[in-house]
Amino acid sequence: MQATDRTQPKPGKSPIINIKKPQSFVLDNGMKILVVENHKLPKVSFNLTLDNAPFAEGNKKGVDELTSNLIGNGSKKTTKTAFNEEIDFWGVDINFSSHGATANSLSKYSGRILELMAEGVLHPNFTQEDFDKEKAKLIEGMKAEEKSVPAIASRVVDVLAFGKNHPTGEFMTEET
């Protein structure tokens, strides 16, 4: 019986990654724009990053996460359902948070996608109903983590490493 050859094959050549230098400019409102063009694929990616310094939320810990969960649920101009249906119709991958937004789609829809992204960021629709649902979800998540050893260990490590008054050392409670 012959032994199976299990020697590792020699690696092939590493691909060459060529990222062009971004074009940069500043809009009238002070927003810095970086553009990197690559026309090999018919897709476009947008990334909005808000330069928010970390801050201690104190007795309001969880507001940032709650805001992140609420943003992108429609806008003051468009209902949540219509907003989500249009995103689905265009086949867009769009995400919002309190720190910015990202969107990926086919480049032929880029104008409308950028409009939807701006609408969601500049005119978010925070309804009481959505607020109550998201708050309930956060509370349920915290209750589930009460008995999770990794979650408890992570909290302890963060408090010991950063202190309880540091943004990373804080943790959410039902009261906050």
Where are the language model's segments positioned?
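Acidic/histidine-enriched segments that form metal/cofactor-coordinating
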Residues: 85-176
